[in-house]
Amino acid sequence: MTAEEIKKKDSEYIMHTYGRFDIVLDQGKGATLWDADGKQYVDLTSGIGVNSLGHGNPAIVNAVTKQAEKLMHASNL
């Protein structure tokens, strides 16, 4: 999907409870992000997990992958 297609679906299906940046992020590594057009950003706005661990930390990716292979989700209901 193109960035414009993603933005259109976002406006149709996502409740906008807070302001958003007008970008479509594609990938991240450490504190660096890239949008769907390949433009690079330094991530100064993400949540606490990214602030302390960075995007794409190999140890975290490995741990999450291993856990997801065993159990993806367990409801507390």
Task: Briefly describe each language-model feature range.
Residues 1-29:
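Active-site-adjacent loop/helix segments that line or gate small-molecule/cofactor pockets in enzymes
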Residues 2-3, 32-37, 57-63:
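Short hydrophobic/aromatic-rich motifs at helix boundaries and adjacent loops
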Residues 16, 20, 27, 35, ...:
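Generic structural "secondary-structure junction" signal
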Residues 23-43:
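Active-site and channel-lining beta-strand-loop segments
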Residues 40-77:
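Glycine-rich loop-to-alpha-helix module at the N-terminal edge of alpha/beta enzyme cores
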